[in-house]
From Swiss-Prot:
<dbReference type="InterPro" id="IPR006555">
    <property type="entry name" value="ATP-dep_Helicase_C"/>
</dbReference>
<dbReference type="GO" id="GO:0005524">
    <property type="term" value="F:ATP binding"/>
</dbReference>
<dbReference type="InterPro" id="IPR012337">
    <property type="entry name" value="RNaseH-like_sf"/>
</dbReference>
<feature type="short sequence motif" description="DEAH box">
    <location>
        <begin position="448"/>
        <end position="451"/>
    </location>
</feature>
<feature type="domain" description="Exonuclease">
    <location>
        <begin position="8"/>
        <end position="161"/>
    </location>
</feature>
<dbReference type="GO" id="GO:0003887">
    <property type="term" value="F:DNA-directed DNA polymerase activity"/>
</dbReference>
<dbReference type="GO" id="GO:0004386">
    <property type="term" value="F:helicase activity"/>
</dbReference>
<keyword id="KW-0547">Nucleotide-binding</keyword>
<keyword id="KW-0540">Nuclease</keyword>
<dbReference type="Pfam" id="PF13307">
    <property type="entry name" value="Helicase_C_2"/>
</dbReference>
<feature type="domain" description="Helicase ATP-binding">
    <location>
        <begin position="241"/>
        <end position="496"/>
    </location>
</feature>
<dbReference type="InterPro" id="IPR006054">
    <property type="entry name" value="DnaQ"/>
</dbReference>
<dbReference type="InterPro" id="IPR036397">
    <property type="entry name" value="RNaseH_sf"/>
</dbReference>
<feature type="domain" description="Helicase C-terminal">
    <location>
        <begin position="714"/>
        <end position="883"/>
    </location>
</feature>
<dbReference type="GO" id="GO:0003677">
    <property type="term" value="F:DNA binding"/>
</dbReference>
<dbReference type="InterPro" id="IPR006310">
    <property type="entry name" value="DinG"/>
</dbReference>
<keyword id="KW-0269">Exonuclease</keyword>
């Protein structure tokens, strides 16, 4: 690594306003030759107030700074320490700009010669990490971080992760290091200096048989699964007893009973629906049932989960735990479709591609690292988003396989017979083509969180044209001879002329003209759609931030679609009879677009349900034209019901009014399902209450002021009495932000952190909410599911409105034709299920203390209140005004205080 010294800096500040806020803590960790050689830390005094959010986040209070120096008192010392170092920080723009500004106020010009952003570094070095927040990285790489958001600890943790990244780079093959170095010249910061030193000082390593080479790529060699040697003569009960004893788990007869039910369905190739409440230990039950089934029959079992998170938990935590205590090994593997796995030929093509913008350069570097680590070749391990995902999707779509290509799917297929348990998720299960996957090896399937299955099917019923996607796909071909695929075609034509290649002449000029006309025709199509939006009734989906048009004439759209399809046909004809791989890539790209437009045109002609969505009413680029081509029931019947001989649907909320009929209605075939409703282990308790205020102003969507004011009054009352955290759920962002504005003005809540849901930030917000003792989280009803509410003492959820979907919701529109009564058969069961899921997340254990406050009195006063009653069987139900609410809170608080004393 040479003799460079790295100063890894972390700052805590009063906020993120560069011209106003100030530093309150600085931590610096010095690294040389992959060793921590020194540290510096100081609290920094400020005359500004430290906001409650910052105090909660950093645990730095104003009293802690009274004896600390002002920055100008230590500025020169800090400057002398770091002026000759490589300046390093995690998300460097924040720390570097703040410290520059602080130095500037002290008449010190700080201009580090080299800077490095560890956010950029870690994305490359750790390409499969799901989050690049420092706390998540520390947890992922087993580096202790006891006090996140304290500058000294954050700086040291960042330094240790940086060392780990450097050591990882140093172990790479020289060819990989060189490629990383050349690509790093396209990055924003100075990583290329470090990589240059690595290449320059490379020490030859002994041959490593774990790696092989394909063209310029060094990749990890796949190790075939060994056929499992299973030696177990006992019963399922014996297996369960062994596992619970070995893992020091509570022996639960109910959990064993659940496992026995599942095994019985598997053994008899039956189809079953099981409602097993949250906290009943479903995962262990079905894993042991699947294992016992494999022991007795040798047959494989597929398990489908709701999310990638649950999928990862099974593969990375639950099954390895079982393997640690069993006398035999369970071979489990992720099962996906062929298109989810990448080939080395495709990676090679990506690396050779001329596109070298920042995002693509990061992607190429990630691929070089990832391919030395992956055992699966599953491209989704990289968690690609945005431009990177679009780029890779396009490369996959237009890839023409090379000779002797190595495809990771073939490895999965080769080892399929030795897989005992296959793990997938609902999206893959529903999307999979049984003829192009190894799904056909599985006759038996257990579907966990089965109540979510229809939602994933709903995502598969439409085809769409997306303005940005079409423009991007055309852009990948290029507009002139110096861009993208057109450049490659022009180069091929020049080679044909100069080297007299034995291929037909290529009309490059005609191709260029046609591509530019296709750009114009695409603009015309989406201008037509945009004009339709301007003259139509537009409905808002406030939760997902989309606007929809459902009722419109399609004549002009069909006319524009036909013009594009005709032009694509003429363009494709240019390449008739040509087989060169460059031509194949362009042709494949054009055919992809042709098929996309043709499918939409035919669906509209066939009078399929069509609609328009737009993210921003002022931006044509956010338009999508969608057509419903399938029924959800058809998809679920074909992709799930008919695919497996044995099916076990399991969920904590599979019944509606104690009946499985609502879920059974999602399938076309009249199947005689075995049904099991396992009672909850939780019993009625003084610590589980639901309160419905009777003094709240009637909800009026045109004037929410009074309704919102009532919600705020109850929040303040709760906080004042309990001093506990609170989750408040809304069905619209508008109401949520109105409540937020009022709460921020209240002096009673000065020491509380008010958190609000933001798109794509749920994980981060939940982490903050769970970490802060005094916090209020305002979110939408999407938080009903999958939210692990952590709190000491009382857990409180306030519900502004019951989670009914609006009749203008896109789901309502898509499902309207599939039910006799959309409200009774779809909307009401959906609302009850979501409500039950929310309660289940709140109360998971016998000693949990929970309070639900529903401002929506439909919970107890509507004609359909009985359908919600099942959710409230273990809650004490109360109605009253805010004084009675205060009385209830004091009763609960006294009970909790007495318990803590005893």
């Amino acid at each position: 690594m040479g003799i460079a010294t790295f100063a890894v800096v972390d700052l805590e500040t009063t906020g993120n306003q560069l011209d106003y806020d100030e530093i309150i803590q600085i931590g610096i960790t010095f690294v040389r030759q992959n060793q921590v050689i020194d540290t510096y830390h100081s609290m920094i005094r400020t005359d500004l107030e430290i906001p409650p959010f910052i105090q909660a986040l950093t645990s730095i209070e104003e009293e802690m700074l009274v004896q600390a120096p002002y920055f100008n008192e230590v500025a020169d010392d800090i400057y002398q320490l770091i002026k000759d170092c490589v300046f390093v920080a995690h998300n460097i723009s924040f720390d570097l700009n703040f410290i520059k500004k602080a130095f500037e106020k002290c008449n010190i010009q700080f201009k580090p010669k080299r800077v490095m952003d560890t956010l950029e570094l870690f994305k490359i070095a750790f390409p499969t990490d799901k989050s690049y927040q420092l706390s998540a990285l520390a947890e992922s790489h087993h580096i202790p971080l006891n006090n996140a958001h304290r500058a000294d600890e954050d700086a040291t943790t960042t330094a240790k992760l940086m060392i780990k990244a450097f050591e990882k780079f140093e172990q790479l093959h020289l060819d990989t290091q060189k490629q990383l170095y050349y690509l790093s010249k396209n990055l924003k910061y100075d990583l290329y200096h470090i990589l240059f030193e690595m290449v320059r000082n490379y020490q030859t390593k002994p041959p490593n048989n774990q790696f092989e080479q394909f063209e310029q790529i060094i990749y990890r060699k796949q190790i075939d699964l060994k056929k499992p040697a299973v030696n177990f003569d006992g019963t399922l009960k014996d297996l369960y007893k062994n596992v619970t004893q070995s893992l020091n788990l509570t022996y639960r007869p109910q959990q064993l009973y659940l496992a026995e039910i599942i095994l019985d369905q598997l053994m008899h190739s039956d189809k079953a629906m099981i409602e097993a409440p949250l906290g009943s230990g479903k995962s262990l039950a079905y894993l042991l049932a699947a294992t016992m089934y494999n022991i007795e029959t040798g047959r494989h079992v597929m398990i489908s989960t709701n999310t990638k998170l649950l999928q990862s938990q099974l593969l990375e935590k639950d099954i390895p735990l079982l393997n640690d205590v069993l006398d035999f090994k369970i071979n489990a593997s992720l099962i996906k479709s062929k298109n989810d796995y990448i080939s080395l030929g495709l990676i090679s093509q990506i690396l050779k591609d001329d596109t070298n913008n920042y995002e693509v350069s990061i992607l190429k570097m990630q691929l070089l690292i990832w391919i030395t680590e992956t055992n699966t070749g599953d491209i989704q391990e990289l968690n690609l988003k945005g431009g990177q995902k679009m780029y890779v999707d396009q490369k996959i779509e237009t890839y023409v396989p090379v000779r002797h290509d190595i495809h990771y799917y073939n490895y999965i297929k080769r080892n399929a017979q030795n897989i005992q348990i296959g793990i997938t998720n609902h999206a893959h299960l529903i999307h999979s083509d049984s003829e192009n996957t190894i799904y056909q090896l599985f006759d038996d399937c257990i579907i966990d969180e089965a109540h979510r299955l229809p939602d994933y099917a709903l995502n598969q019923v439409t085809n769409d044209l997306n303005y940005s996607d079409v423009k991007y796909q055309l852009g990948l071909i290029g507009k002139n001879e110096n861009e993208k695929l057109l450049k490659a075609v022009d180069k091929l034509e020049q080679q044909r002329i100069l080297e007299k290649l034995d291929i037909a002449p290529i009309d490059v000029f005609g191709l260029k003209i046609n591509i530019n006309e296709l750009h114009d025709l695409n603009e015309q199509l989406f201008t037509t759609i945009y004009n339709i939006i301007q003259t139509s009734d537009v409905y808002d989906d406030d939760i997902h931030k989309y606007h929809y048009v459902y009722d419109f004439e399609t004549g002009e759209i069909l006319k524009d679609l036909r013009a594009i399809i005709d032009k694509l046909n003429k363009t494709i004809e240019i390449f008739n009879g040509m087989n060169h791989k460059t031509i194949k890539s362009v042709r494949k790209q054009l055919l992809y677009l042709h098929d996309k437009f043709k499918l939409i045109e035919q669906s509209i002609k066939d009078h399929h349900t069509s609609f328009i969505s737009i993210k921003n009413l002022a931006q044509k680029s956010t338009i999508r034209l969608l057509v419903k081509d399938y029924d959800v029931k058809d998809i679920l019947t074909k992709q799930v019901l008919e695919k497996f001989k044995s099916l076990t649907f399991i969920s904590g909320t599979l019944t509606f009014n104690h009946s499985f009929k609502a879920f059974q209605n999602w399938f076309n075939e009249d199947i005689d399902f075995n049904t099991f409703e396992i009672s909850t282990p939780l019993t009625s308790s003084n610590h589980t209450n639901v309160f419905v205020p009777n003094d709240v102003e009637t909800y009026n969507y045109k004037n929410l002021d009074d309704y919102v004011a009532s919600i705020v009054d109850y929040i303040v009352e709760y906080i004042t009495v309990t001093q506990s955290k609170c989750l408040v759920l809304f069905t619209s962002y508008k109401m949520m932000h109105m409540v937020q504005d009022l709460l921020n003005e209240l002096p009673e809540l000065e020491d509380y952190v008010i958190l609000t849901q933001q798109q794509n930030q749920n994980y981060k917000i939940v982490q903050q909410f769970n970490n802060f003792d005094k916090s209020i989280l305002l979110g939408t009803s999407t938080f009903f599911e999958g939210f692990d509410f952590q709190a000491n003492g009382l857990k409180c959820v306030m519900i502004a409105k019951l989670p009914f979907m609006n009749k203008h919701n896109i789901k309502y529109w898509l499902m309207d034709s599939e039910f006799t009564s959309t409200f009774k058969d779809y909307v009401l069961p959906d609302a009850v299920t979501r409500f039950r899921q929310g309660l289940g997340r709140l109360i998971r254990h016998e000693d949990d203390k929970g309070l639900i406050v529903s401002f929506d009195d439909r919970l107890v006063n509507s004609t359909y209140k009985s359908f919600f009653a099942q959710s409230l069987e273990h809650f004490k139900q109360r109605k009253g005004n805010i004084k009675q609410f205060n009385k209830l809170l004091n009763q609960i608080q006294r009970s909790i205080d007495n318990e803590s004393k005893s």
